[in-house]
Amino acid sequence: MTITIGQYVEKRGLFDNVDDWLRRERFVFVGWSGLLLFPCAYMALGGWLTGTTFVTSWYTHGLATSYLEGCNFLTAAVSTPANSMAHSLLFLWGPEAQGDLTRWFQLGGLWPFVALHGAFSLIGFMLRQFEIAQSLKLRPYNAIAFSAPIAVFVSVFLIYPLGQAGWFFAPSFGVAAIFRFILFFQGFHNWTLNPFHMMGVAGVLGAALLCAIHGATVENTLFEDGDGANTFRAFNPTQAEETYSMVTANRFWSQIFGVAFSNKRWLHFFMLFVPVTGLWMSAIGVVGLALNLRAYDFVSQEIRAAEDPEFETFYTKNILLNEGIRAWMAAQDQPHEKLTFPEEVLPRGNAL
C-alpha cells in the first residue's frame, strides 16, 4: 500500500482571483462596489464638466448655460431636456439623437446621462461603505446614514419629474439652476408650508446644532495629558484611552438644561437619527409633490382676506407671492408654451 503525503491545494476559479484583486489592500480600495462607483462617478462628473463647458441650452430652455457662452461657475448648468422629450432616456443611439452627438447635446441628452450615472454612483458609494464595514467587522451605520442624501437625490431629480410631464421639470445641474428650481417649488407647490419640508429643515438645522454642541463639549472636556493644554499638541493620536470626560460633560449639560445624555451610544445614535430622519422626511415630501399633493391650505384665512381688505396674515401674503411667482415664472420658464397673461395679473414691483 502506498501513502502519498502532500499539501492540499484549494482550487481557485476566476471569481476567487477577481475577488482577491478587487478587495486587496491598496491606497484606494476598489472592491466590488467600485465596479459600479468609479465608472458611474467618472461618467457623471465628466458629463457635467462637458455640459457646463460648451453645451448650450438655447434649444431646450432658450438659455445660455456654458462657459463658452459667457456663464461663470454659479450660472453654468447642465439643463434638463426639452419638454417635448417627456420621459425619454435620450440614449445617444436612440430615435431622438440617432447617434449624432451634436444633436444629442442640443436635445438635452446630457441631463439624463448625468442624473442616472450620478444616482448609480451614489448607490455605489453607499455599497462601498457597506463593503468596507463588512471587511473590517464594523456595523453598517455609515451606509445607512448615506441612504438619506441618496433618497433626497433620487426623489428630487428622478421621482419628481417622473410624476410631472417630463424631465424638463427636474432641477438642472447648476447652482443658479437649483435656486430657480427652489423658487419654482415654492410658487407651484407652496413647499415651505409642507410639513415634510418642515421636518427636513428641523432635521438639518437640528443636526448642525447637535454637531456644534457635541464638538464644543468634547473640546471643553479634553484631558490635559500631554505636553500642554493645546488641542493640537496635547494628545497622542494613537493613545488607547478616551481623551475626554463624559462624566464632566454630563454634569455640565445637566446644570445647563437639567437633562443630559448619560451614555455615548445614545448620544451618537441621536446625532445619526436627527439628520437622517429629516432628509428622509424631505424625500417623502418631494415624492408627494411628484403626485401634486398639496401642503397646508388655510382656506378660511384666504376667504376672509378676499372679503375684508384690512385682514391679512403672513399666510395670505405668501399665497399672493406664490401667485406672482406662477404668473411671472410660467411664461419665463416654459417659453415653448407661449403663455400670455393679462397685464393686470402680472406682479408689478412690491404691489401684488
From Swiss-Prot:
Bilayer topology: Multi-pass membrane protein
Listed name of the protein: Photosystem II D2 protein
Biological processes, Gene Ontology terms: photosynthetic electron transport in photosystem II
Family according to the record: Belongs to the reaction center PufL/M/PsbA/D family.
Note: 2 of the reaction center chlorophylls (ChlD1 and ChlD2) are entirely coordinated by water.
Function per UniProt: Photosystem II (PSII) is a light-driven water:plastoquinone oxidoreductase that uses light energy to abstract electrons from H(2)O, generating O(2) and a proton gradient subsequently used for ATP formation. It consists of a core antenna complex that captures photons, and an electron transfer chain that converts photonic excitation into a charge separation. The D1/D2 (PsbA/PsbD) reaction center heterodimer binds P680, the primary electron donor of PSII as well as several subsequent electron acceptors. D2 is needed for assembly of a stable PSII complex.
Coiled-coil annotated spans: none
